[in-house]
């Protein structure tokens, strides 16, 4: 079994090697639109052979889903934003949470791809996520990209920035400050903004 955090090719490219594949219900529903477009773009950028992803055959998961791995029951938390159906997986037995790309992996959370939610919707999603993470705030969190475990300061200096509940809290605050124009994003194409330990990259049309 493969449990995907979201439908992007850098996470699902080898999904065809598994008999059972789980994916957020909203990602399955959005596949034929912006998510497939984002996948085609990312596959092209990485110069990978094209593949067909039979997403319609994947097992949909929601916040009510529990995955029983032989007595180790994995809890699902919905966290739309990076994709419409992004999810986190909570392993209570090993006291860890797999966050995928929902809140970044130390570097910025990427919200500029086709299918990413607008900022106000992402902020609302983060509010629900913070509440869901309260009981497991002391669990170790594993992001989706090891090579992105470092943040970067205003002058480009890198620092170790592991995914924690504090990063999610700072992301929520950052979204609010961007919407209230208390923080102005920098950049001309993709925009970037930073607050505390959180950083976000998004498009100008998402600032609403």
Residue ranges and their predicted role:
Residues 1-10, 22-25, 78-81, 98-100, ...:
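Active-site neighborhood of phospho(di)ester-bond hydrolases with catalytic His/Asp-centered motifs
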Residues 14-17, 34-36, 92, 111, ...:
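Short amphipathic alpha-helical segments
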Residues 1-68, 166-167:
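Active-site HxH/HxHxD metal-binding segment of metal-dependent hydrolases
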Residues 127-208:
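Accessory terminal helices/loops
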Residues 8, 27, 108-109, 113, ...:
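Flexible, active-site-proximal loop/turn residues at the rims of small-molecule/cofactor binding pockets
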Residues 11-14, 30-32, 106-108, 149-153:
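Short catalytic/ligand-binding loop motif for oxyanion handling, primarily in non-cytosolic enzymes
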Residues 13, 52-124, 128:
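Catalytic core of the metallo-beta-lactamase
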Residues 25-27, 34-37, 41, 80, ...:
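Short, flexible active-site-adjacent loop segments at beta-strand->alpha-helix junctions, enriched
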């Amino acid at each position: 079994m493969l449990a995907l955090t979201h439908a992007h090719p850098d996470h699902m490219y080898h999904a065809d090697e598994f008999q059972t594949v789980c994916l957020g219900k909203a990602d399955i529903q959005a596949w034929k639109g912006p998510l497939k477009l984002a996948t085609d773009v990312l596959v092209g950028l990485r110069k990978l052979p094209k593949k067909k992803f039979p997403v319609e055959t994947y097992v949909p998961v929601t916040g009510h889903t529990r995955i029983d791995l032989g007595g180790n029951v994995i809890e699902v938390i919905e966290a739309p934003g990076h994709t419409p159906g992004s999810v986190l997986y909570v392993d209570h037995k090993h006291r860890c949470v797999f966050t995928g790309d929902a809140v970044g992996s130390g570097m910025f959370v990427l919200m500029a791809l086709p299918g990413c939610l607008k900022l106000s919707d992402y902020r609302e999603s983060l509010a629900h996520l913070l509440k869901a993470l309260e009981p497991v705030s002391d669990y170790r969190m594993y992001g989706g990209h090891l090579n992105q475990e470092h943040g970067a300061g205003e002058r480009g200096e890198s620092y170790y920035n592991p995914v924690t509940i504090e990063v999610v809290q700072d992301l929520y605050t950052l979204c609010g400050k961007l919407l209230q124009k208390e923080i102005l994003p920098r950049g001309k194409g993709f925009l970037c903004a930073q607050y505390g330990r959180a950083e976000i990259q998004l498009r100008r049309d998402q600032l609403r």
